[in-house]
Amino acid sequence: MYIVFYSTSDVFKAEEILNNNNIECKVVPTPVQDKAYCGVCVETHDEQAKTLMEDLEFEVLE
């Protein structure tokens, strides 16, 4: 799943949160061409990731 954000700083906050919780993830280019999102996102296969980032504004793309 791709977790997309409106700001690059949120992408790196999310990556840090996930890494600190031992959830495998990587920062990749956003797969959609939508100017509402920044150019990078977090890719992970762990459903728990969504609950760990409740304080950040994001959307999930499957």
Enumerate the language-model features and the residues they cover:
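Positively charged, small/polar-rich N-terminal and surface patches that mediate targeting and assembly
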Residues: 1-62
